[in-house]
């Protein structure tokens, strides 16, 4: 990847964007620079790019000597982890809308214009983009179920169509009105990834809180805002699949404790009662994929039960 170059001749835009890219490891340096350059090529005059380094001094020093001055490069000033890094970016942002792009995701051509457009409608408080899996091997493993794209942070079968309302976006490509995000105090540090810990659900809680705080406003899926999300070979294994499912269940238990089961599991009820059974039927000619569906559901459920038990134990100890 060549050095990131400055971008000139920017057009004036209607809705200003603050694009936040959070990174934490030098192992993704090439991907981080590609994500930044692709974003830089798309910004308009009133937009800004904020790169947040999550408690990694070596990476911070490297990027300081690499990135052009027009990019705001800052260190996570909150608790270590993705939620703290995102909150650092939000605190620094000045745009009307904060766009979040993962450090291993590359926005498609025109993605930022597509991220901007829905916010001309004042009823839209947030959007989720399309997250296309870019498998290092060229394609998903034969056993991998389409219904479990969320395991690798990508789109999955069962998502609403473009323009329809969603509970929450996928974190690799999402955008939120800055004032609304500040109003709900950003992302909870009780949830979300810390380094390689496979936790999640911080975007789910954000969506739940936005719906509660801004009734009558909408979070919609807008597939024109598309990114290609890199999936390394080590995430194309059954071991990663089961660990991620289990940690998702644990995270859902924390979410249920914070927001209540009704809000925490509203989308999952339809997913488990309708999408997974139909997925098993679609995959009936591929026994390995059917087995992966069952295993994925089992590990997620086990994580949830474990998380609820730990929450109950903690509540009892605190009483």
Which stretches of residues belong to each language-model region?
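N-proximal low-complexity "stem/linker" segments adjacent to membrane-targeting elements
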Residues: 1-38
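Short, acidic, metal-binding catalytic loop of nucleotide-sugar glycosyltransferases
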Residues: 37-46
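Short aromatic/hydrophobic "clamp" motif used to bind/position activated sugar donors
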Residues: 98
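Short, flexible, basic/aromatic active-site loop/helix in glycosyltransferases
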Residues: 129, 145-166
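Conserved donor NDP-sugar-binding/catalytic core segment of glycosyltransferases
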Residues: 110-143
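Non-catalytic, C-terminal membrane-associated alpha-helical segments of glycosyltransferases
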Residues: 243-247, 257-319
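Glycine-rich, basic loop-to-helix element that forms the pyrophosphate-binding segment
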Residues: 76-93
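A short, conserved alpha-helix in the catalytic core of glycosyltransferases
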Residues: 171-176, 180-184, 191-225
């Amino acid at each position: 990847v060549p050095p990131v170059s400055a971008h000139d001749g920017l057009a004036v835009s209607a809705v200003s964007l603050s694009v936040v890219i959070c990174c934490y490891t030098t192992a993704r340096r090439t991907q981080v620079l590609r994500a930044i350059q692709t974003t830089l090529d798309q910004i308009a005059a009133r937009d800004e790019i904020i790169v947040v380094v999550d408690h990694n001094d070596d990476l911070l020093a490297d990027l300081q000597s690499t990135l052009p001055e027009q990019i705001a490069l800052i260190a996570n000033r909150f608790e270590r982890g993705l939620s703290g890094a995102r909150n650092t970016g939000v605190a620094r942002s000045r745009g009307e809308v904060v766009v979040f792009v993962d450090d291993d995701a590359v926005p498609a051509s025109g993605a930022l214009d597509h991220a901007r457009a829905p916010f001309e409608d004042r009823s839209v408080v947030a959007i989720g983009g399309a997250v296309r899996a870019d498998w290092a091997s060229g394609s998903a493993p034969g056993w991998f179920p389409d219904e479990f794209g969320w395991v690798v942070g990508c789109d999955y079968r069962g998502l609403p169509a473009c323009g329809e309302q969603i509970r929450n976006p996928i974190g690799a490509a999402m955008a939120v009105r800055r004032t609304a995000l500040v109003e709900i105090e950003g992302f909870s540090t009780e949830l979300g990834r810390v380094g390689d810990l496979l936790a999640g659900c911080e975007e789910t809680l954000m969506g739940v809180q936005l719906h509660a705080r801004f009734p009558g406003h909408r979070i919609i899926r807008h597939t024109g805002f598309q990114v290609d999300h890199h999936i390394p070979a080590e995430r194309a294994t059954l071991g990663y699949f089961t660990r991620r499912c289990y940690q998702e269940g644990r995270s859902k238990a924390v979410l249920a404790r914070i927001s209540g089961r009704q809000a925490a599991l509203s989308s999952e009820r339809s997913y488990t009662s309708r999408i997974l059974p139909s997925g098993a039927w679609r995959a009936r000619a591929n026994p390995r994929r059917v087995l992966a569906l069952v295993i994925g559901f089992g590990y997620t459920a086990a994580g949830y039960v474990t998380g609820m038990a730990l929450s109950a134990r903690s509540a009892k100890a605190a009483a």
